[in-house]
Amino acid sequence: MLLRSGSKYIITAEAREEIKKRNGKLVTIDEMVEVSKSTQLDSVGDVTTTNLRRAGAKLFLQIVDLKTKRGESIFQHEEGSITVRNDPGTISFDLIEAIKSSIENNKPTRIEVIGEEDLAVLPIIYYSKNNTVIAYGIPDVGMAALTVTDDLRDHVTEVIAKMAIE
């Protein structure tokens, strides 16, 4: 994901359609707690992250924006978190770098996003090793998960190629 400082990827209609082709499987909290015992588990979204933590899941990456789907700020900042800006419908250079650094340095990290974290799943897939599991929330539905494979990473590369760069 080559991007220069200050730049960002912007979702396009074509990229959004490509994303829809690979939805994760609906999962339960208990399933994800079990997964976290033997596999790297990352979470995207405040409700997903909070529920997994309360249930005792071991999380490597936690990416949150401290808001609910309605925009209410009901979640709290945690000391030691990395804070990055990421506008809705985009993937910022700073978000990519925070994810990449955490994965490359094998350092569990909580990233608090000012803006929106929804598209963070893409750079997580791009940089994660195979078999990493990423849990994320689907509003009004539940929680879904994707397992990183070479095929999924190739799909993400195609999605990114269809995004605009600003």
Curated annotation (Swiss-Prot):
Pathway: Cofactor biosynthesis; coenzyme A biosynthesis. InterPro entries: GTP-dep_dephospho-CoA_kin. GO terms for biological process: coenzyme A biosynthetic process. It catalyses: 3'-dephospho-CoA + GTP = GDP + CoA + H(+). It holds the Pfam family DUF359. Its EC number is 2.7.1.237. GO terms for molecular function: GTP binding; kinase activity. GTP binds at D46, V47, D65, K67, E117, D140. Disulfide bonds: none annotated. Keywords: Coenzyme A biosynthesis, GTP-binding, Kinase, Nucleotide-binding, Transferase. Catalyzes the GTP-dependent phosphorylation of the 3'-hydroxyl group of dephosphocoenzyme A to form coenzyme A (CoA). Belongs to the GTP-dependent DPCK family. This is GTP-dependent dephospho-CoA kinase. It comes from Thermoplasma volcanium (strain ATCC 51530 / DSM 4299 / JCM 9571 / NBRC 15438 / GSS1).
